[in-house]
Amino acid sequence: RFKKIRRLGALPGLTSKRPRSGNDLKNQLRSVKRSQYRIRLEEKQKLRFHYGLTERQLLKYVHIAGKVKGSTGQVLLQLLEMRLDNILFRLGMASTIPGARQLVNHRHILVNGRIVDIPSYRCKPQDIITTKDKQKSKALIQNYIASSTQPQEELPNHLTIDPFQYKGLVNQIRDSKWIGLKINELLVVEYYSRQT
């Protein structure tokens, strides 16, 4: 993880750690001119590691986004932002996306009153995300919310949370302008368009 954030910059979905800022020798050596291919590859890797996707999963999302009307890059980010594991992370119910994925896989999360154990489940507007009534599930979420470094005002406007009832609400489709990650999604689309 630390090698990834040193190379690609801050990846809040992967870890809460930040790369060290300093003018050490390594940073000076890295200022060598990068090729266009490498720039596109690094943007793709940033997106992949932030959301915790395999190469195959990301390629699938790029293909889906390409078939939808609108900017492929914007649609791609919207698809990734509306995944259940990412919504839990954005709500502050998990400290990282892999942590949110584990909550979903272990069947602690309900969407509209039904257990969902698929982290890639695509949330829709008006979906209500809650925990199971079991004490263990509530304790896990309570610990995450209590230790959350994300202040309430940083909650994206497409989400609402009630921390006392362990309940989140998806208000609308995510606006891809606010993803909390410095990324040029067009370079990711270009990377894949040149691969085929």
UniProtKB/Swiss-Prot annotation:
Keywords: Chloroplast, Plastid, Ribonucleoprotein, Ribosomal protein, RNA-binding, rRNA-binding. The keyword Heme does not apply. GO terms for biological process: ribosomal small subunit biogenesis; translation. GO terms for molecular function: rRNA binding; structural constituent of ribosome. Residues 82-143 form the S4 RNA-binding domain. PROSITE patterns: RIBOSOMAL_S4, S4. It is found in: Plastid, Chloroplast. GO terms for cellular component: chloroplast; small ribosomal subunit. Transmembrane segments: none annotated. One of the primary rRNA binding proteins, it binds directly to 16S rRNA where it nucleates assembly of the body of the 30S subunit. With S5 and S12 plays an important role in translational accuracy. Part of the 30S ribosomal subunit. Contacts protein S5. The interaction surface between S4 and S5 is involved in control of translational fidelity. Belongs to the universal ribosomal protein uS4 family. HAMAP family: Ribosomal_uS4_B. PANTHER family: 30S 40S RIBOSOMAL PROTEIN (PTHR11831), SMALL RIBOSOMAL SUBUNIT PROTEIN US4M (PTHR11831:SF4). This is Small ribosomal subunit protein uS4c. It comes from Patersonia sp. (strain Lejeune 1997).
